[in-house]
Amino acid sequence: MKSYEFVLRRLATILSVAIISLSVMAAVTGILLSFYYEPVAGRAYQSLNWIDTEIPNGLLIHSIHDIAGNALIVTALIQIVVMFLGRQFRSSWLTAWISGILLTLTGIGLSWTAIILDWSQVGYWRFRIELSTIEAIPFIGGTLRNILTGGGAVNTTTVAHLYTIHSYLLSVGAIALAIVHLWGLLQQEKEMKGNAVEAVAKSEKLQQQRNFSQTLS
């Protein structure tokens, strides 16, 4: 049982390091893309196509950005399952667990806000359909729609709003949550090692007391 828990803790830590690596990879490639990307309706598609075809290694950077973003979500979901199987009811585990869930939701948010950034036909109509679903949410649907679109039709303002949310708010949040997540796991590992050392010390002390009692008798 202890070996099983040890493997799960090690796997959780490895996945957490992978999550941070993917977050940094997505952030760095996103910054490189932002030098040439134009968050303007009608020109967003052309700018991305120009990056892919004219900029040296542009297609590679664009592909790495997409793959890292998708891999982040998959890795975070696997991480949640691993942490659930090896759950320890302590504050460090709870910190890692909650930050892991929030990180997964942030990754999904990053993926969702990117669907219209290329201003393709597929992305445009998919966003329109999902925007209707958001608008149907009671009480806050209209407000959310105005935040995303800028209060009007789906146009340049919408692209600019989603670009800001994607590139600044969610990206910074993802990196921060990944760091908190790893910190929680490392704290849990530290606590487990401390408990193990304490248990060994107590066992040795008891053994010494028994040996001393046997010597006296």
Go through each PLM region and give its residues.
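Membrane-embedded alpha-helical bundles that constitute the cytochrome b-like, heme-associated redox core
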Residues: M1-S217
